[in-house]
């Protein structure tokens, strides 16, 4: 068979590390949902600002916005 049986006595628990101990409080909130909208409006603002940033970069790339002193090929 391809499967292997492990005895209960020889099985060790999870290994404790310093990084794991530091990150454990962050994982303790797993599965909990804040009531209401939470930070959804903040995320919407961040997405809108990112869209504006991308449109500015696109306009510069397409030479729609002319910048003084910068030559575009």
Curated annotation (Swiss-Prot):
UniProt keywords, alphabetically: Chloroplast, Membrane, Phosphoprotein, Photosynthesis, Photosystem II, Plastid, Thylakoid, Transmembrane, Transmembrane helix
Subcellular location(s) of the protein: Plastid, Chloroplast thylakoid membrane
UniProt region (Disordered), positions on chain: 1-21
Transmembrane segments annotated in the record for this chain: 41-61
Post-translational modification: Phosphorylation is a light-dependent reaction catalyzed by a membrane-bound kinase; phosphorylation occurs on Thr residue(s) in the N-terminus of the protein.
Polar residues bias (residue ranges): 1-11
Molecular function GO labels: phosphate ion binding
Phosphothreonine: modified positions: 3, 5
GO biological process: photosynthesis; protein stabilization
Entry's Gene Ontology cellular component terms: chloroplast thylakoid membrane; photosystem II
Family to which this protein belongs: Belongs to the PsbH family.
NCBIfam families, per database record: PRK02624.1
Subunit structure: PSII is composed of 1 copy each of membrane proteins PsbA, PsbB, PsbC, PsbD, PsbE, PsbF, PsbH, PsbI, PsbJ, PsbK, PsbL, PsbM, PsbT, PsbX, PsbY, PsbZ, Psb30/Ycf12, at least 3 peripheral proteins of the oxygen-evolving complex and a large number of cofactors. It forms dimeric complexes.
HAMAP family linked to this entry: PSII_PsbH
Protein name, as recorded: Photosystem II reaction center protein H
Taxonomic path: Eukaryota, Viridiplantae, Streptophyta, Embryophyta, Tracheophyta
Gene: psbH
